[in-house]
């Protein structure tokens, strides 16, 4: 008999259809639970899937390059980056009537097109690409790379090429290679590209394969390098009147420390960026020689961890036992990787707008808003995933004997203190912040705005002043002309930095006031509550006073039946599920705040944010009600415009979001009754009753319905906000 889906679990494949399909999909990637899995096969499958993942990423980026080269307007955009709208790709839609064709034909195109808001035009322009031919070459190269990775993935599943478990668990070698090779050498290679291709291109010199070996990136070549006169490479930098992409005002320096932004492009100096990558390369290549491998020199990670016993014995046995615990748990390693990647992704969001690296991207407001929002949402999902896998580690991989008395065991031992402190912080933040907003709201409603409680964020303003922002008059560190710090940096990066930080037209160290103070604490409430739910879910995943044997039930279970009342809703999966709602709402506040503050900055009316953000009706009326006007105007009595697609997506996003509640609020019994009624009708309907089922149709389980509800809530939430963000920004700024 041909085995049915899922082939990896004979038990599941014999189950009734609903359970078989749902649990089959849910456990498809849970290799640990598959039939006949061994530790060796587990590691090899994950290793091979990494090659597939990389192949997909390169295929996707290749597609971006290819479609822009084929249907975009890259060469036209380069001539006037501030006024030509960059095209992502053409739209072919047989339903388009004449009004739609006219509305979507823009950016100098001959037919309907999509405008690009991911910043790839600015990125490609900055790194030295100039023609469609360059884009096609890049697309083809990435396609070939993608194929190589697919072949490598297949190859490493063949008996002769399968790595052993000991190879996967060789942490020191992996660290050395990832630090030196992945980060170090790739940063060095990127420095090379910037110095040999991007910087000459920004000065009007065209360097390609045909002249790469003959075009000197610096007039003195490698002479100063070997003579130890490295400062020569920083001399004669581009002037402040330099026109990007031309020789006008260009210098010859390749590695500088100018600080601040290029006046015309409003982005970091390319020569500063090259210097930064060279420094990263040096640091990481050295770091990749730290750990002991076959050569018997360097640090042993295990020895470092075992030796690290805290002074005074206040922290028990410190890190003893951690090396083997982490090295033998894929979930622990994944949790650490996701936590790091989540933080990095959020930092990318914060830095892409405040310190823009790509030429002219700072003046493309819709792209700035889209990139910030995109990276914050991605960060939220990745961070919640870190806690999910942390909980799975505690359930599946944690061994109490191995970790006796170490920092991990002590986390579990005093979990009540951790959870209650987080709870207290969340309650404090929530009540005080809401109290201030509501008080201010009532004062405005009663016509006495002067009775608002407005708190200046003095600590944050002091920190901004220490970095050189003069506006607040704090006269401290870099904002004080007498400080040693001020004098020390005067000859290198400081003048450029101070000009930039005190220039009110960019997003670096934005001026903050009482509205920022309030929303900052609202966001802090969201962050602490999300963390509380996730930390509690992980720390209670093995067991709690209510359910001491919880780990026997696994990561996700609905309840343990009526015999133990009150065991519903307490699996680690339920904590993850609850936390995602808080995560989404928190990032909602973050992105609303960012967007409103920037809209007023870009329009030159910062007073609107400053005055309206201190009370609830201000947020509702002057941001959430005022800005969707473009969305509800996508179709009007005069026909349609180019925002109509966002208007439709805005409505569709609300629909998907609302469908989520259908699954979240009505539970299993309702659906089971409904299904049985539908089945009854089906069996009595001519023609329809020719189609029969082998097993009884059943409703989704509680956990399955929650997953479907959560998926619709998340997707609808993001679709709605994406449409709102892009339409309200592009509608204002063209």
UniProtKB/Swiss-Prot annotation:
The alphabetical list of record keywords is: 4Fe-4S, Chlorophyll, Chloroplast, Chromophore, Electron transport, Iron, Iron-sulfur, Magnesium, Membrane, Metal-binding, Oxidoreductase, Photosynthesis, Photosystem I, Plastid, Thylakoid, Transmembrane, Transmembrane helix, Transport
Annotated TM spans = 46-69, 135-158, 175-199, 273-291, 330-353, 369-395, 417-439, 517-535, 575-596, 643-665, 707-727
Does the keyword field hold Nucleus? no
Known partners and oligomeric status: The PsaA/B heterodimer binds the P700 chlorophyll special pair and subsequent electron acceptors. PSI consists of a core antenna complex that captures photons, and an electron transfer chain that converts photonic excitation into a charge separation. The eukaryotic PSI reaction center is composed of at least 11 subunits.
Q: Please write the reaction equations for the catalytic activity of this protein.
A: reduced [plastocyanin] + hnu + oxidized [2Fe-2S]-[ferredoxin] = oxidized [plastocyanin] + reduced [2Fe-2S]-[ferredoxin]
- Chain residues that bind [4Fe-4S] cluster: 559, 568
GO cellular-component terms in the record?
A: chloroplast thylakoid membrane; photosystem I
InterPro entries given for it? Answer: PSI_PsaA/B (IPR001280), PSI_PsaA/B_CS (IPR020586), PSI_PsaA/B_sf (IPR036408), PSI_PsaB (IPR006244)
Record's protein name: Photosystem I P700 chlorophyll a apoprotein A2
What does the organism's lineage look like at the top? Eukaryota, Viridiplantae, Streptophyta, Embryophyta, Tracheophyta
* Cofactor binding remark: P700 is a chlorophyll a/chlorophyll a' dimer, A0 is one or more chlorophyll a, A1 is one or both phylloquinones and FX is a shared 4Fe-4S iron-sulfur center.
GO BP field: photosynthesis
Q: Does the keyword Hydrolase apply?
A: no
- Quick one: which residues bind phylloquinone? 671
Binding-site list for chlorophyll a B1: 654
């Amino acid at each position: 008999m041909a085995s049915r889906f899922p082939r990896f679990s004979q038990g599941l494949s014999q189950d009734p259809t609903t359970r078989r399909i749902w649990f089959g999909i849910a456990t498809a990637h849970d290799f640990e639970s598959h039939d006949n899995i061994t530790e060796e096969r587990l590691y090899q499958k994950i290793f091979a899937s990494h090659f597939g993942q990389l192949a997909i990423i390169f295929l996707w980026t290749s597609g971006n390059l290819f479609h822009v080269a084929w249907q975009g307007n890259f060469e036209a955009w380069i001539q006037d980056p501030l006024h030509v709208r960059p095209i992502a790709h053409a739209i072919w839609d047989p339903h388009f009537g004449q009004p739609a064709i006219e509305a979507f034909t823009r950016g100098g195109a001959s037919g309907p097109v999509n405008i690009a808001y991911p910043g790839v035009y600015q990125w490609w322009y900055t790194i030295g690409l100039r023609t469609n031919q360059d884009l096609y070459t890049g697309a083809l190269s990435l396609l070939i790379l993608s194929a190589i990775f697919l072949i490598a993935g297949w190859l490493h599943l063949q008996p002769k090429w399968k790595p052993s478990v000991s190879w996967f668990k060789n942490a020191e070698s992996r660290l050395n290679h990832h630090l030196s090779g992945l980060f170090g050498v790739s940063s060095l290679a990127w420095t090379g590209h910037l110095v040999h291709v991007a910087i000459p291109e920004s000065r009007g010199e065209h360097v390609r394969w045909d002249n790469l070996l003959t075009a000197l990136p610096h007039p003195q070549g490698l002479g100063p390098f070997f003579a130890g006169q490295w400062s020569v490479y920083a001399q004669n930098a581009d002037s402040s009147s330099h026109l990007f992409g031309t020789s006008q005002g260009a210098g010859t320096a390749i590695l500088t420390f100018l600080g601040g932004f290029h006046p015309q492009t409003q982005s970091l100096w390319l020569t500063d960026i090259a210097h930064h990558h060279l420094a990263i390369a040096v640091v990481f290549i050295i770091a990749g020689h730290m750990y002991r491998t076959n050569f018997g020199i360097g640090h042993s990670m295990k020895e470092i961890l075992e030796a690290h016993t805290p002074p005074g014995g206040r922290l028990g046995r410190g890190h003893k036992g951690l090396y083997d615990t982490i090295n033998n748990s894929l979930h622990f390693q994944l949790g650490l990787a996701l936590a790091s990647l989540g933080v990095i992704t959020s930092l990318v969001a914060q830095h892409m707008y405040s310190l823009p690296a790509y030429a002219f991207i700072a003046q493309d407001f819709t792209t700035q808003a889209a990139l910030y929002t995109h990276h914050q949402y991605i960060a939220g999902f990745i961070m919640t995933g870190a806690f999910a896998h942390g909980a799975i580690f505690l359930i599946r991989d944690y061994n109490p004997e191995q970790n006796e008395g170490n920092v991990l065991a002590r986390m579990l031992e005093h979990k009540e203190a951790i959870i209650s402190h987080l709870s207290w912080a969340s309650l404090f933040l929530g009540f005080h912040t809401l109290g201030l907003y509501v008080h201010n709201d009532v004062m405005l409603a009663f016509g006495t705005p002067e009775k608002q409680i407005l708190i200046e964020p003095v600590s944050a303003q002091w920190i901004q002043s220490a970095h050189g922002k003069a506006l607040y008059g704090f006269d401290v560190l870099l904002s004080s002309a007498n400080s040693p710090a001020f004098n020390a940096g005067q000859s290198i990066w400081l003048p450029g930095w101070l000009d930039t930080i005190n220039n009110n037209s960019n997003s670096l160290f934005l001026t903050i006031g009482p509205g920022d103070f309030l929303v900052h604490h609202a966001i802090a409430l969201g962050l602490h509550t999300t963390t509380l739910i996730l930390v509690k879910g992980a720390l209670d995943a093995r067991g709690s006073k209510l359910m001491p044997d919880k780990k026997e039930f696994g990561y996700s279970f609905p309840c343990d039946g009526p015999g133990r009342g009150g065991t519903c809703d307490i699996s680690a999966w339920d904590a993850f599920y609850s936390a995602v709602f808080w995560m989404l709402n928190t990032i909602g506040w973050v992105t609303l705040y960012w967007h409103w503050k920037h809209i007023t900055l870009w329009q030159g009316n910062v007073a609107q944010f400053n005055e309206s953000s201190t009370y609830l009706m201000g947020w509702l009326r002057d941001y959430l009600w005022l800005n969707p006007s473009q969305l509800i105007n996508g179709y009007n009595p005069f026909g349609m415009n180019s925002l109509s697609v966002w208007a439709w997506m805005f409505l569709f996003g609300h629909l998907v979001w609302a469908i989520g509640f259908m699954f979240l609020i009505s539970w299993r019994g309702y659906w089971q009754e409904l299904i049985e009624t539908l089945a009854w009708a089906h069996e009595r309907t001519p023609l329809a009753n020719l189609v029969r089922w082998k097993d009884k149709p059943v409703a989704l389980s509680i956990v399955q319905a929650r997953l479907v509800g959560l998926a619709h809530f998340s997707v609808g939430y993001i679709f709605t906000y994406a449409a709102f963000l892009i339409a309200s920004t592009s509608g204002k700024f063209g």
